[in-house]
Amino acid sequence: NPSKYTESYGFAGTSGLVHLEGQYLIPRDHPSKTLFLFMHPTTTLQLLPMPTALAAAGLHVLCAASRYPKNDAGLIMENVAVDMGAWIRDAREKRGYEKVVLVGWSGGGSLSLFYGAQHESPTVRTTPAGDPVDLTAAKLPPVDGIIFIAAHLSRAETLEVFTPAVVGCVRMLM
């Protein structure tokens, strides 16, 4: 029963709003219409070397957090997909990016793959526990590519197969 479910993460409470935090790494004097979005289900990534190296090379980077920062126990992956969609929507509609590329580092790889699958053909209406998270109604915005860095299977075992077709795709996105 959805009326019995109240989101308590992301400072949501009964307000119906979820608070998300992130850090844009935007180099000066390097305009871009492409954003590289790093997101992990339960941690932030701005202190890792790759986001800062990409920004230093002139690329626009967002290190986005979900509503579960540093909280693996409370994680609901379906909600994290909704959070990722909110970041993508913000990047396109409010910040003017034409292309958004997901960069899946570690658990972000399985998150990016899950997001990509659900945006293209949404099937999830509830969590395995029966919590109401309807991705078929979430209107997840599209992405223009996915890059995997040290991605792994994840707890949910969502990342099972790689295809060699991904080699060289980054050149097409730039």
Annotated model-derived regions:
Residues F36-F38, V61, I146:
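Hydrophobic beta-strand anchors of alpha/beta hydrolase catalytic cores
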Residues N1-T34:
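N-terminal cap/lid segment of alpha/beta-hydrolase-fold proteins
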Residues K33, F38-L45:
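Active-site glycine-rich loops that stabilize anionic/oxyanionic intermediates
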Residues R67-V101, S121:
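Catalytic nucleophile-loop/oxyanion-hole region of alpha/beta-hydrolase
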Residues P51-A73:
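Conserved alpha/beta-hydrolase
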Residues T42-L45, Y68-K70, G107-G109, L153-R155:
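Solvent-exposed loop/turn segments at secondary-structure junctions
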Residues D90-E93, K99-L173:
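Primarily recognizes the serine-hydrolase "nucleophile elbow" in alpha/beta-hydrolase
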